Every structure is written in C-alpha cells, then in structure tokens.
C-alpha cells in the first residue's frame, strides 16, 4: 500500500511512517503551512525526482537518509519560492483615488509628431534619453556637490600656492594629483551640462540636439571651455612651481553658486545655511586679501619697512604657518576696519590699503547687515509669539483673571512653543495652489483620516474637501472636550494625547481614548432613528495636553452638498454602524420615513396650489392682453378704412374727366 504526500509516492519500506511527511515531522511544521505555500510544477517535478531517488536508495541508507533528503528538498523549495511569497506593499487607496493614475513622462521630442523610420535609431535615442539629467532631481543635485568641491579647492588653494612658495614646493605632488583630478571633474561636468534637461512649455526637454544648442549658445559654455584649456603646458616653458598658470580654472565658479542656491532651497534650515554661506564668503575674501598682502610684501621686499611682512630670515617669521597666520591676521584687521596695523609707507601700499578699506566698508557692511537681517528673521517667529502672549497677559490683568487661570493659560502657551505647534498651517499654505494644498493635507492627515469609519472608501473629491477642513485644536489637562447632553456640532480625531470617558463627577473613568481614536462622527450626520440623536452621550476629558483634529458639522454638510451620492453613502454607513451597535430604532426610522413622505406630499400640494394660482393669474393676464390687442386692431382697421375713403375721393376730384366736365 502506498500513500501520496505532496504528490510524491512513498516506498513500501516506509509505509509505517505514512501519517505525516518526514520533512514536516523533522521541522516541526504544520501540514497546512506547507500546503499553503505556492509552488510551481517545476518544483513538484524536482522534489518528486529527488524523493524517487531516495526511495531507491532507502533500503541501503535507511530512514534517516530519506529524511535528510526530503528535508533538503523542503529547504530548496522554500528558498526558491521565497520571492514569490513576498508581496509588494500596496499603495494607499486614499492617495490612489486622489492622485489618479501616474502619467507617463512626455518629452518635447515625443510630442512633436516626428517618428523615426529606423527602429534601431529610435531605440538608440531612447537609450540616450535615459542619461538626461533632470535639473530638479536628486542625481543632478549630487553632481552639483561633486563639482562644487574642486571649484572651492581651486578658489582657495590656487591663489595660496601662487603666493606662498613654501606651500607649493612642500606638497607639489599632492597638488598635482588634486589638480588633475579636478580637471577630470571639470571635463565630466562639461558633458553633464550637455546632458542636462531644461523645461520647455512645462515639459522636460530630452532631445540631445536641443540640449546641445541650448548650452553651447550661452556665456557659461564659453567660460566652461576656457576653464579646461590645458594651460598646464606652460609648465614646460616655466617652472612647475607656477600654479598661477592654472588661474583659468577659477572661471568655473557658477557651479558652486548653483549648488549653494539649490541647497538653500532644499535644506530644512535655510537661515542657518545662509549664515554659514556668508561666513564662507567672508573667509574666502579674507583669505584672498591675505595672499595678496603676502605677494605685495614679497614684491616690495620682506622687512624693508614697517608695513610689509617682516623679514623671513628671522626664525620667528620664517616658517609657513606663521607667514599665513600673520597675513590672515593683518587681512582680518584691515577688512573689518578695526585698524591697529602698521601704516603704509609707499604709494602702492597706500593704494592697496585704500582698496581694502573700500572692500571692508562696502562688502563687509553688506554682509554683516545681511547676517543681522537673517538673525532677526530667525527670531521673528519667537517675537510674534511672544507678542501674542503679552497681549493675553495684558488682557487677563485688565479683566482681573484669577492667578490659577492665568498660570493655566501661560502653561498652554509654553506647551505650544515647546512642541512647535505655533505654526498657522492655513497661513503658511495659502500661497500654494489648491491641488498642492490638498495633497500636502492628505499626506499629513492620511493616517488620521483612515481611522474614521464613515470615511472608508469615500469619493476622492469629498476626501479632499474634508481634509482641507480639518482644524487642529490643543486642549489643556482637565479640559472637557464635550459634556453629556451637549449638542454634537463637531467630530474629533485624536492625534496625540489621552482622553478619558468620565462620569458626571469628572473623576470616575469608564474608558480611555488614545491616539488614533475618534468620536462624534455619527452625531454630525443627523441620522434619523438614532437613539443618541445629535446629543453627546458621555463626558470626555483630556488627561494631559491633547492634540485633536476637529471637523465641524457645518463643514461636513458644506462638503457633501456637491456630492449627493457620497452623502447617501455616508448616511447608509452610519446607519449600519448604529445597527451593529444597537443604537438604531428601526420603528422610528420607518415613522420618520412616513413623516418624510407626508411632508413631501404636503409640500407637493402646496406647490401645486401655488402653481394653480400662478397659472390662473397668467391666464387672466393673457385674456386681458388679448382683449386689449383686439381693441387696438379694431381701432386700426377703422382708421385704415377712413384713410382709404379719403384717398379715393381726392383721387376722383383730380381726374381729367372731372376737370373737362367742369370747364364751360
């Protein structure tokens, strides 16, 4: 007697072990877990073949060998089907309904109606389009960071190496490596520029010819080409320790400023970044001025007067670190107009100091002013919030509010500031279009809305309306959100904090509500037959500081006005919830339906009577107007007849026969 196990026949030698598959016994797994695992026909064939071989060798190897083989088959099968068992996370249905299907990227090349005759050429162009960078994308931003590093390196170290010969000669191998690495990055950036898309009529251009023409006809292209001219060949004519021949590399500065601009847009701390950026500019200006001061001192002669750098033959001033720090110190004192430096002696020294003073007055005054403005902007939020607190304090003192209430209000303000809840979301987002505001609101409040039972599977348009109408509210410890018997005008969704359902004494707790819970959603629908009506059935009190989202009844009714089908669905879902909880009076529902029918019939009768009255009035007006019209027509006919008779008599008197008869 043989028995099938997962499609495999067992040998007679193993019939005594037919109650469960050996692999399942060895692993301690249940039979239903193995049977529920998806597997293909190829897996069954493989396992069947291996087990068949095991059955042949079973008399020689025994029961343990067969178990090991079947166990190995189970492991292999589980590994092979691992990827098939893993399901991709499903996209959220709320966002799916709101965003709709994804649009495929359309380029200007695809939209101009020109197709390629050769399929291979078309495929090649498609491959090239894959390498077009979106200037708003992350890859482009990462490349800006890469290219900004060699630009900053050249701007800081080229001038220092050109002025401080010890710096150049002491590490010239390191400088050669860094120089040519930066040159490679510059050349790569030239090709990246040729593959960087731009927007035309709102679409990203990926046509290589358009990209090339758009870049080549700009001034930046000429500067980029000039920055990679191999001026290093001049090394063969002059000394290798002449880094000034590479000053053309400084022309690639635009990339560094572009990186700074995009970082300022992307960062969550723009004020801190702006201040850091200005500090960097100050340091670079001071650094350049220090290098130029050292170069002027070298050209005039070290130690020839009190203004130039001291004689380098003095051991105290003859090493590189002291040279640079001394020049940096002199540059800082001069540019910040602090003074306390030796006065100039020669004319060229006077001119240089005058130029430095102008830079210090104009540029540094501007920079320091910007820093002060940024710091003021950073404190603007705090100042505005403090002004609100002061106004409330003044009001409470004027109205002689108790000290306990005053302390409670101050603690509430402190909680708002500490937890960064002072931001007015509507004021911040008012400059965005409605579509973006709705999408941001959905991303922020999505997890909260999914907790509300009546809003499951509602229309995307209604969901957008409701999301935009959610209003955050913060309650202090001990505050009542609602009291028993109050008319329900809002529903609440708990974002953070804990609420307690308490007795009338305010102390005894019946239940505890935490983040994600919601209440009051049924009362704002005015469902007929509800035993609760539209009144609160419990006292709900905040245990600590609680953040809630509030949706008022008026806002809900305003939103569902344009969605009558959604309103019916919400009411039906509310009735289902009340029926499950035993809070729906079906007799009252039937009675209310009869009352509604009677009311509708009464309204119909009233409307019919009004219609009859209006029709009779219109008919009377029509009859009167018709009589007046007939009278006017009769008058006109009479006048026409009289006029015709007068014309006939006048024509007869003027005829020739009558004239001849009248002659004697």
UniProtKB/Swiss-Prot annotation:
Residues 1-144, 198-222, 266-272, 380-664 are cytoplasmic. It is found in: Cell projection, Cilium membrane. It is a multi-pass membrane protein. It catalyses: Ca(2+)(in) = Ca(2+)(out); Na(+)(in) = Na(+)(out); K(+)(in) = K(+)(out); NH4(+)(in) = NH4(+)(out). GO terms for cellular component: ciliary membrane; Golgi-associated vesicle membrane; intracellular cyclic nucleotide activated cation channel complex; non-motile cilium membrane; plasma membrane. The olfactory cyclic nucleotide-gated channel is an heterotetramer composed of CNGA2, CNGA4 and CNGB1b subunits with 2:1:1 stoichiometry. This is Cyclic nucleotide-gated channel alpha-2. It comes from Homo sapiens.
């Amino acid at each position: 007697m043989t028995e099938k196990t997962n499609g495999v026949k067992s040998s007679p030698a193993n019939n005594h072990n037919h109650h469960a598959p050996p692999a399942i016994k060895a692993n301690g797994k249940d039979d239903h877990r193995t049977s529920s695992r998806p597997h293909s026909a190829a897996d069954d064939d493989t396992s069947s073949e291996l087990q068949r071989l095991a059955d042949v060798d079973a008399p020689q190897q025994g029961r343990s060998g067969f178990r090991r083989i079947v166990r190995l088959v189970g492991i292999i099968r589980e590994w092979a089907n691992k990827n098939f068992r893993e399901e991709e996370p499903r996209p959220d249905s709320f966002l799916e309904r709101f965003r709709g299907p994804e649009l495929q990227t359309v380029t200007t090349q695809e939209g101009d109606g020109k197709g390629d005759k050769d399929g291979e050429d078309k495929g090649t162009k498609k491959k090239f389009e894959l390498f077009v960078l979106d200037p708003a994308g992350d890859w482009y931003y990462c490349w800006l960071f890469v290219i900004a590093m060699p630009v900053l390196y050249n701007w800081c170290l080229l001038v220092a190496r050109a002025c401080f010969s010890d710096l150049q000669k002491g590490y010239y191998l390191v400088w050669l490596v860094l120089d040519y690495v930066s040159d490679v990055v510059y050349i790569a950036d030239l090709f990246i520029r040729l593959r960087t898309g731009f927007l035309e009529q709102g679409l990203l251009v990926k046509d290589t010819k358009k990209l090339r023409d758009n870049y080549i006809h700009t001034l930046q292209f000429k500067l980029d080409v000039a920055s990679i001219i191999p001026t290093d060949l001049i090394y063969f004519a002059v000394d290798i320790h002449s880094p000034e021949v590479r000053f053309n590399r400084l022309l690639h500065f635009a990339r560094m400023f572009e990186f700074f601009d995009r970082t300022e847009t992307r960062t969550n701390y723009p004020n801190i970044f702006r201040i850091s950026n200005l500090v960097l500019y100050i340091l670079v200006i001071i650094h350049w001025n220090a290098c130029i001061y050292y170069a002027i001192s070298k050209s005039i002669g070290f130690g020839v007067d009190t203004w130039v750098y001291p004689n380098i033959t003095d051991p105290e001033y003859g090493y590189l670190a002291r040279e640079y720090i001394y020049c940096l110190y002199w540059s800082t004192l001069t540019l910040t107009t602090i003074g306390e430096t030796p006065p100039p002696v020669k004319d060229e020294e006077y001119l240089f100091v005058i130029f430095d003073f102008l830079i210090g007055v104009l540029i540094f005054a501007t920079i320091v002013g910007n820093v002060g403005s940024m710091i003021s902007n950073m404190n603007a939020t705090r100042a505005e919030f403090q002004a609100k607190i002061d106004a409330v304090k003044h009001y409470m003192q004027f109205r002689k509010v108790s000290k306990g209430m005053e302390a409670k209000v101050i603690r509430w303000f402190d909680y708002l500031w500490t937890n960064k809840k002072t931001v007015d979301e509507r004021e911040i987002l008012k400059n965005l279009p409605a579509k973006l505001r709705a999408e941001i609101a959905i991303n922020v409040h999505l997890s909260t809305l999914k907790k509300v039972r009546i809003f499951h599977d509602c229309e995307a348009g209604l969901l957008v309306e409701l999301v935009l109408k959610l209003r955050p509210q913060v309650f202090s410890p001990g505050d009542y959100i609602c009291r028993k018997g109050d008319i329900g005008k809002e529903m609440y969704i708990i974002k953070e904090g804990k609420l307690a359902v308490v007795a009338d004494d305010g102390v005894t707790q019946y239940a505890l509500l935490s983040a994600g819970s919601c209440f009051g959603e049924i009362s704002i629908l005015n469902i007929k037959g509800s035993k609760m009506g539209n009144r609160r059935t419990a006292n709900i009190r905040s245990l600590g500081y609680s953040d809630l989202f509030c949706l008022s009844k008026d806002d809900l009714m305003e939103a569902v006005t344009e969605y009558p089908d959604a309103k019916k669905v919400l009411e039906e879902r509310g009735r289902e919830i009340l029926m499950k909880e035993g809070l729906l009076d079906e007799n009252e529902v039937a009675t209310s339906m009869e009352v509604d029918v009677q009311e509708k019939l009464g309204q119909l009768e009233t409307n019919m009577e009004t219609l009859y009255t209006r029709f009779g009035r219109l008919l009377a007006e029509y009859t009167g107007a018709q009589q007046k019209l007939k009278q006017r027509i009769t008058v006109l006919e009479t006048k026409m007849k009289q006029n015709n008779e007068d014309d006939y008599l006048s024509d007869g008197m003027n005829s020739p026969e009558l004239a001849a008869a009248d002659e004697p």
